[in-house]
Amino acid sequence: MLTQSVRRGLAEFFGTFMLVFAGTSAAMFAADGLLAVALAFGLTVAVGIYAVGHISGGHFNPAVSFAMVIDGRLTWKEFAYYVVSQLGGAAFAAVVVFLIGGASTDAAPLAVEAWVVIAYEVVLTYVFVYTILSVSKRKELGSFVGIIVGFTLAALILAGGAVSGASLNPAGAFGPALFVEDALANYWVYAVGTLTGAGLAALTYKFLGVPTE
């Protein structure tokens, strides 16, 4: 029988795989551009939450897990386990997408200055993570949590995708970057932006003392 830690790790691997597979596929092949990407990520994160959220919490995102540590819902040891699972799921999803569909190996340069991308990622991730921290403890929302999180993610991608790419997720940026030449050179921008936004969201949530009932 699988231990709780293994079950949680597998759930995060599976959920992150679904999210990155759907989002990366839409980004590479969908004709509708940003709208298709937003819907792919938003709908998939909602499905993932309903599918395995009861096992691991349905993070699928190291930034979300980082915020959960700050809020006291996850230990640092659990955080490390979650992140390994999330990065593994993202990398495997990228492997599948690139093997099946193929893609250019040339990385597109940042469309704007790095600090602009970081600023957008901080703000977008802040809103996303704060929403998750809040709704995940609102018992009256019940089964609507997945829909709210998915809708929020889709809306934020539409809002910032044209500027920063709207990653909001270090794992989501990591997987595809492994298979695109020179893309890892810009990875730090997304890691810094998303983790900073998540940390600020968690600190704000704790400072405000948002009620859990």
Map each language-model feature to its residues.
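Membrane-interface helix-loop junctions and terminal tails of multi-pass membrane proteins
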Residues: 1-213
